């Protein structure tokens, strides 16, 4: 119910390309967000998605995040995870286009799940490095199968509670954090904690993407806090995700745009 009212509020205040006076945002919106073409990687990842949806296997799941609205228990079918936890094709492919557009060398993903979104993040360029975090070893094992099936060798999976693994992984980075997708814990405090940890490794050209910014009142509060952070110069609310930029040479701006 919260998401329904949140979407109605979003629809009333959001717009499209008409009236966009920022050349950067206009180009991003028309070339990436509203892009209607296809890429070769789409078919391969979606074929793997169908394999997971058809799977009869069950695994024991440990969830360190806010859980799901489905109320599913500890033992879960792989097909159910693919159906309810994996990002839908439209959103996962948007993330692919964002990475393809900005060409980051180092990509961080908080929340691997079965590896479908990770695969999209990695498939744009085999030369860039994707580091992804998954709390549950059994889920991570399925993700590894996904990467092997798609011949993706540029992905490193960090297993364990992100609260314990994120800081040391960031400390060991030998390059700036160019792109980060936050999908690991849909609660206020952890979201802001992960954001602040990653801030120390960003550049002015870094892109942070936050998933499910209207998922709950808690996540909306976190998003508002991120928007007003002094280092954040530009944010784009696409309802399902929020884009964060740190571009210094422009005034602070916020946009709400329909996908």
Give residue ranges: language-model regions.
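A short alpha-helical cap/connector motif
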Residues: 1-181, 185-207, 213-259
